[in-house]
Amino acid sequence: MDTVTSALLTDLYELTMLQAARQAGTASRRSVFEVFTRSLPEGRRYGVLAGTGRVLDAIADFRFDEADLRYLRRTGVLDEETLAHLADYRFTGDVHGYEEGELFFPNSPVMRLEGTFEDAVMLETVILSILNHDSGVASVGSRMITAARGRPCIEMGGRRVHEDAAIAAARAAYIVGFASTSNLAAGAHYRVPAAGTSAHAFTLLFDSEEEAFRAQIASQGVGTTLLVDTYDVDAAVRLAVEIAGPELGAVRLDSGDLGAQSIRVRALLDSLGATSTRITATGDLDEFRVEELAQAPLDGYGIGTRLVTGGGHPAPGFVYKLVEREGADGQMHPVGKRSQDKATLGAGKRAFRMLVGDRAHAELVLPGEAEIAEFQRELTAELISAEASPEWRRTNLRPLQVPMIRGGEPVQSLRAPQQVEAARARHAASFAELALDVEDGPDGPIAIPTVTDGIEAARVLR
């Protein structure tokens, strides 16, 4: 498919809403949109926000060029006045949001857009497309890193998704702690370390496994990783050490009972003097399989399909909702759906992570200035109360939303690799605040509650 502008990465109804609002005289009303998810997938204790940097780039590039306008004119859906407006469109509003790599929970307002209705409504699809995909990968990837317990993980799922999604997935995986990627485009654009040596096809190309191993070592050196399960694993390990010597970098297992094989291979390597040779496991791994292999003598994992497809939950269910807008009286009013199972809390919100010492205790999502003021009054009352627990003395609030765009201009301009490194650091710091017990396994209850009431928020530690 030919390259398309980010402006066409949208749904038609964004433009039909825009046209109808312009015709009704309401398109210029000041509006606040928020991105959030109503729930986490069952068993997920937290989510990880990824894709923010890509969203900011998409907003900056959101333009309708002449080819776009010709196509839209051919559809016959939009009138000439609307098309003329689209020709000059530039986002001129404000964006606040959670930093990329930050954790999120149900109802966390991970991104807030403020501007006119016509300014913000068109961005819904592209924002959700990026955040849902990248956060889906990051959320499961973080679980995999936890299950790996410090063993390095390589992202290697590029052959399982769309070519552009593969690059985004590698980026998201690196943010949550993956050590490297097999994807060269991610390495070139985002400076994610690239890794890879050979597949079974390389061994099968030669008349014997010995010829294949000798060719790879001659090209890559003795520190390379040899794939040893094409034929007979034990024979391949002996052959690998015979050719490379005890300084052989690593062997890779890609099939069979990885746990049992790794025990046998480790013993064999040690008996041959290759005590520093590492063992890497690949082959349809996910966080549950990695957890099962925790006691196996493995040194790292290569993870593909289950990572880049979100591990059974490809999207965290982010939605983009109008929560506040200007009325005919010129004042801002909270708005929200009341429908069953999809009700939304009106008003633009402020979010804080409540910490006791350095440990996360609650997600505070407070709607409107009145709710924030009420929380501050109640918090003060609690602090001076005779019933205040010692924990209160160690309590602080970490603001979660930061300005990203003001008046259509980026607040901070970072190159793509800098964005990714900053997000990687943010994720590591935020995850550490949860202080999860790795022995509990991947699944469990949501790590901290989301509190949306000022009085309840001030009393959550009592």
Task: Describe these PLM feature segments.
Residues 32-34, 92, 153, 319, ...:
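A residue-level signal for beta-strand positions that form part of recognition/binding surfaces
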Residues 70-71, 139-143, 157, 439-446:
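Short coil/turn segments at secondary-structure boundaries
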Residues 55-62, 71-72, 85, 130, ...:
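Residues that form generic nucleotide/phosphate-binding pockets
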Residues 280:
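Contiguous mid-protein beta-loop-alpha structural module that forms a pocket-lining wall or clamp
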Residues 20-78, 146:
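Extended boundary segments
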Residues 1-29, 39-41, 77, 83-92, ...:
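Buried, small/hydrophobic-residue-enriched core segments of structured protein domains
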Residues 1-29, 43, 272, 277, ...:
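Gly/Ser/Thr/Ala-enriched C-terminal appendages of enzymes
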